[in-house]
């Protein structure tokens, strides 16, 4: 598949092979990662990458866009069908740019916005001080209840009434419970705010009908197209309001982007077509079943799941019962070919670079075909490693590392990813 890369750039070819090997023979539990289909990968590697297409279908600033117009229209139409909305912009290069475009469409620098605190499960673009959103807006953050570790909507309402934000953002990157979009919209309406829902993490679940569709309540919905959607890395913005759609389009181009990535937009179209199938719905149902099972098995073995469990594809695991940091856990599991990410937990006492938890997700494991019985095996392996972490450098006895590596390899060989489908 990469014969020309091999001829022209052996070093990059080697990188591709090593990364292919890492994905094929390791367990991927990072909640924001997934494995795109070969159809999506092929679309991204097509000649569509050569075409500049500033503007929108039928209104381009360059000639020769007749075929990329077809690709973008297909992507838009399929996104609208998938999420039952009237309007879709599929040009954002990422979820962060989708959020930026949505914010800029309805606000001005210096306006007040409300979003979930990053340390409580939000996202950088929801007002973190180091992000553009925290630099150009007056940010009011809400969090989860210190006892239940779920959103307290009465507290959100109190903050909104006090600060009168222009935008209220719902959604997060490490929140495992169903969000009440109806309640958020009621709060937004009460204070005259726009409700923007960032569904990047759970878009696939929404597409499959097993998570409430935020488009029923939000003024604007943003998302990535990878993660649970299993498409190319990119973003999109959805709305049912024609005037907001016009503002969103201007905000993306010429507001914050120039030429769209037409090869990625074509891959988005492929992804949306895949997501409209019954097979995709079955996949998403299994993702949630696997997440619930993994959380249950980890709890049985002494770990604490933040908020008491999960309704989605992800969970946040509190490592304090084992006196292990998120940083050490990430390193130790990585040595055993199990990929996770360290993550802060509510009421965090450590630096984000150390953290007290890890975030786990099941989309990538489920893409391989794994089910509940494999989640039990994986929970056993995770706990075996974590119980034997020696220090902050994530050191574990070689015998344990070798044993877990072997079991991980066996699991991956039982559920191959691209093996036999891609010619190296």
UniProtKB/Swiss-Prot annotation:
Q: Which reaction does it catalyse?
A: (6R)-5,10-methylene-5,6,7,8-tetrahydrofolate + glycine + H2O = (6S)-5,6,7,8-tetrahydrofolate + L-serine
Q: Which residues carry this modification: N6-(pyridoxal phosphate)lysine?
A: 227
Q: Does the keyword Transferase apply?
A: yes
GO molecular function, a single term: pyridoxal phosphate binding
Q: What is its EC number?
A: 2.1.2.1
In which compartments does the protein localize?
Cytoplasm
Pathway info:
One-carbon metabolism; tetrahydrofolate interconversion; Amino-acid biosynthesis; glycine biosynthesis; glycine from L-serine: step 1/1
Assign the protein's first listed, main location to one coarse class.
cytoplasm
Entry's Pfam families? Answer: SHMT (PF00464)
The record's listing under InterPro entries reads:
PyrdxlP-dep_Trfase, PyrdxlP-dep_Trfase_major, PyrdxlP-dep_Trfase_small, Ser_HO-MeTrfase, Ser_HO-MeTrfase-like, Ser_HO-MeTrfase_PLP_BS, SHMT-like_dom
| Family of this protein | Belongs to the SHMT family.
The job of this chain, per UniProt, is described as:
Catalyzes the reversible interconversion of serine and glycine with tetrahydrofolate (THF) serving as the one-carbon carrier. This reaction serves as the major source of one-carbon groups required for the biosynthesis of purines, thymidylate, methionine, and other important biomolecules. Also exhibits THF-independent aldolase activity toward beta-hydroxyamino acids, producing glycine and aldehydes, via a retro-aldol mechanism.
Q: How does it assemble?
A: Homodimer.
Q: What is this protein called?
A: Serine hydroxymethyltransferase
Q: Which gene encodes it?
A: glyA
């Amino acid at each position: 598949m990469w014969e020309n890369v091999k001829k022209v750039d052996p070093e990059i070819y080697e990188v591709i092979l090593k990364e292919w090997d890492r994905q094929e023979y390791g367990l991927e539990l990072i909640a924001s990662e997934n494995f795109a289909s070969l159809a999506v990968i092929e679309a991204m590697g097509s000649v569509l990458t050569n075409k500049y297409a500033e503007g929108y279908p039928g209104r381009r600033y360059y000639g020769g866009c007749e075929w990329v117009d077809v690709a973008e229209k297909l992507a838009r139409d399929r996104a609208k069908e998938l999420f039952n909305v009237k309007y879709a912009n599929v040009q954002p290069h990422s979820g962060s740019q989708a959020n930026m475009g949505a914010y800029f469409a309805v606000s001005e620098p210096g306006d007040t916005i409300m979003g979930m605190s990053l340390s409580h499960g939000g996202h950088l673009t929801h007002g973190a001080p180091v992000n553009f959103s925290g630099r150009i807006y007056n940010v009011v953050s809400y969090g989860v209840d210190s006892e239940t570790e779920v959103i307290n909507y009465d507290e959100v309402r109190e903050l909104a009434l006090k600060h009168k934000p222009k935008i209220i953002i719902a959604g997060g990157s490490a929140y495992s419970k169903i969000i009440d979009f109806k309640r958020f919209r009621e709060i937004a309406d009460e204070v005259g705010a726009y409700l923007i829902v960032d569904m990047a993490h759970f878009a696939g679940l929404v597409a499959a009908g097993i998570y409430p569709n935020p488009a029923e309540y939000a003024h604007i919905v943003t998302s990535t197209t990878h993660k649970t959607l299993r498409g190319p890395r990119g973003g999109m913005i959805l709305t049912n309001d024609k005037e907001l759609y016009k503002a969103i389009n201007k905000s993306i181009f010429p507001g914050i982007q120039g030429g769209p990535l037409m090869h990625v937009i074509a891959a988005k179209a492929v992804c949306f077509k895949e997501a409209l199938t019954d097979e995709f719905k079955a996949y998403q149902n299994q993702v949630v079943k696997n997440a619930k099972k993994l959380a249950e098995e980890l709890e049985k073995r002494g770990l604490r799941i933040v908020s008491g469990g999960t309704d989605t594809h992800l969970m946040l695991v509190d490592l304090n019962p084992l006196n292990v940091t998120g940083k050490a856990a990430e390193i130790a599991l990585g040595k055993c070919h199990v990929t996770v990410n360290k993550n802060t937990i509510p009421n965090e006492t450590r630096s984000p670079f150390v953290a007290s938890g890890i975030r786990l997700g099941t989309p990538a494991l489920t893409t391989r075909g794994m089910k509940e019985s494999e989640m039990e095996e994986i929970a056993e392996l995770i706990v075996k490693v974590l119980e034997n972490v020696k220090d902050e450098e994530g050191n574990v006895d070689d015998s344990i590392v070798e044993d877990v590596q072997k079991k991980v390899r066996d699991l991956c060989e039982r559920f191959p990813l691209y093996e036999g489908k891609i010619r190296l």
